[in-house]
Regions:
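Cysteine-centered loop/knuckle micro-motif
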Residues: 49-53
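Short, charged beta-turn/beta-strand-edge "cap" motif at the junction between a beta-strand
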Residues: 46, 277-281, 295-297
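A conserved acidic, glycine/proline-rich C-terminal tail/linker
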Residues: 28-29, 251-283
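Loop/turn positions that initiate beta-strands
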Residues: 12, 269, 285-287
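Catalytic-core "active-site belt" of small-molecule-metabolizing enzymes
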Residues: 62-246, 287-289, 297-303
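N-terminal pre-ligand scaffold of iron-sulfur
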Residues: 1-44, 48, 60
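Short Cys/His-rich micro-motifs in 6-15 aa windows
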Residues: 54-60
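Short strand-turn-strand beta-turns centered on an Asx-Gly dipeptide
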Residues: 26-27, 231-233, 274, 293
Length: 303
């Protein structure tokens, strides 16, 4: 087709092309001649030369796909979620959880892989919602998860509503308590590092969480602490808490920015998981324990 005119609808993702072009097979044989086609940008009909209206139910379809993966503990293939719809899918998933009686208790912060031509992997911060149903008391059933990884983190409890982006100097005005935490990262796409839009749609791969005893935030120099993760009481990794964003308190600042951009307000008493200080540990049955010097520890049994 010569001199095509192309328009993409920013809301639906559909692409309107003015002109006539031919759809051919691998051998160059013409399958169909299409005039002024409307190409589907939703990602669900990539094998079709024209829009089949799939995008109308896109959010519901992908949300259900990810919810089924979680419920059945069976990985699904990433669909290459379109950016604007990723946020809608994350929100819809939370709404569905709340509709069945779960309660929102906070968010987890972490990094997601960006699409890039660079040899080195590039990541950007994202968040996922946490509900009370994700909290581990003493035991975790590994059979309910897909590709669980155990990560050592710091957990922050909010003293007041986090309703805007804050600075590092303001953190203690917003955080009342801290605790050691273990996040179980569980990607619904299996043991892969998903690209950012798929990761957002998957609620930042939130699986399960364990939280230790709360201590007052101002009474501990968190930047001078070390965080260790043990498997069956054998030390697996030990790092400075500065492995979290260069300063663990910065995790709250970063989270506040992402939440503000998304229009999300976390009420007082909510929690924020910092993002992992350690490399994720592929989980097998056994005891997992995280310790933060001067703060405390948390543990659970995986079966």
């Amino acid at each position: 087709m010569s001199n095509p005119s192309i328009f993409q609808n920013p809301k639906s993702g559909s692409i309107k092309v003015d002109g006539t072009f031919q759809v051919v097979d691998a051998e160059g044989k013409v399958i169909k001649t299409v005039t002024d086609p409307k190409l589907c940008g939703c990602g669900l009909s990539q094998d079709k030369p024209f829009c089949d209206k799939s995008h109308a139910n896109y959010v519901s379809i992908v949300t259900r796909m990810l919810e089924d993966a979680r419920a059945n503990a069976k990985a699904v293939t990433p669909v290459g979620v379109w950016n604007m719809r990723a946020y809608e899918i994350r929100k819809r998933s939370l709404e569905n959880r709340l509709a069945v009686g779960e309660n929102l208790i906070g968010v987890k912060f972490g990094g997601a892989l960006l699409k890039s031509d660079s040899v080195e992997k590039c990541y950007e911060g994202i968040f996922g919602f946490l509900t009370d149903a994700m909290q581990i008391e003493t035991e975790l059933n590994l059979g309910s998860l897909i590709a669980p990884l155990a990560e050592a983190e710091v957990v922050f409890k909010l003293a007041k509503d986090l309703d805007r982006s804050i600075s590092l100097e303001e953190v203690f005005d917003f955080v009342s308590h801290i605790a050691p935490g273990i996040e179980v990262f569980d990607c619904r796409y299996g043991a892969i590092d998903p690209y950012i839009d798929d990761a957002i749609a998957d609620n930042a791969c939130a699986g399960a969480i364990a939280i230790g005893t709360w201590v007052e935030a101002k009474s501990h120099d968190l930047t001078a602490s070390e965080i260790s993760i043990f498997v069956n009481e054998s030390l697996n990794q030990k790092v400075s808490t500065k492995a979290i964003a260069g300063n663990p308190w910065q995790a709250v600042v970063n989270a506040s920015e992402k939440l503000a951009n998304a229009g999300v307000v976390l009420p007082a008493g909510s929690i924020i998981f910092s993002g992992s200080a350690t490399n994720g540990i592929a989980m097998q049955p056994g005891k997992y324990r995280v310790e933060i010097t001067g703060v405390g520890e948390v543990s659970f049994e995986a079966k």
